[in-house]
Design a protein with these regions (language model features):
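TRAFAC-class small GTPase G-domain
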Residues: 1-207
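Extreme C-terminal disordered tails of eukaryotic proteins encode short linear targeting/docking signals used
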Residues: 206-216
């Protein structure tokens, strides 16, 4: 473990108030403007935010103390987000992924490009820099499936929202340990996603499965 990472973990333990507590990291990845920051606001502050909120290149969230459901063990979880910014940020971004215990890859239900980029860019990036970390796949902004404004905008480009079936197939293709859908606007599925990511940091996570958190 690098010295700067050791210092970071020590600081996290002090912030939590338990210097002996195990610490695990969850990295959120995906294109910009898919709703990652809105998810954080809802999860940490219970604040619904329908607008796009730009974030810095790297933003950390947490830490939070989490109790594993199966074992009852406590662990400190910290969350990182390296905003989508293209290949120019690869050198900076890979440092965060290399120390991640779990990676959550996010795409917007209303953006075919962000969906395609999971397989074309983000999954290869994770395989290169965090190959041992379990992946959780998340389709965000599910409210776009029923929002006529967004449906009309997609129709102008002969597009439709990403379906649940498409999301599950992609999860299987990238060997994700889980597939979830959520909406920060409606407040659905966010807590379940964060809980699943925390659970996936447990070392007993060994097999691939695809599951859905219903948000309809």
């Amino acid at each position: 473990m690098a010295q700067n990472e050791t210092v970071t973990l020590e600081c996290i333990r002090k912030e939590i108030g338990d210097e002996n507590l195990p610490v695990k990291g969850v990295m959120f990845g995906g294109d910009g403007a898919v709703g990652k920051t809105s998810m954080y606001l809802y999860y940490f502050l219970e604040k619904k935010e329908p607008k796009y909120i730009p974030v810095k290149v790297e933003t950390d969230y947490g830490p939070k103390i989490y109790t594993y459901k199966k074992t009852g063990e406590k662990v400190g979880i910290y969350y990182d987000d390296h905003e989508g910014g293209g290949e120019d940020w690869d050198r900076l971004r890979h440092l965060g992924y290399e120390r991640a215990d779990v990676v959550v890859l996010c795409f917007s239900i209303g953006s075919r490009k962000s969906f395609d980029n999971i397989e074309e860019y983000w999954y290869p990036f994770v395989q290169k820099h965090a190959s041992k970390a379990p992946i959780v796949l998340c389709g965000t902004q599910t409210d776009m499936r029923t929002d006529q404004f967004y449906l009309d905008r997609l129709a102008e480009h002969n597009q439709k929202p990403i379906t649940n079936v498409e999301g599950k197939k992609l999860a299987q293709k990238i060997k994700a340990v889980g597939y979830f859908e959520c909406s920060s606007v409606e407040g659905r599925g966010v807590k379940e996603l964060f809980d699943a990511a925390a659970e996936a940091t447990h070392p007993d996570i060994t097999k691939t499965k695809s599951e859905e958190c219903s948000v309809m």
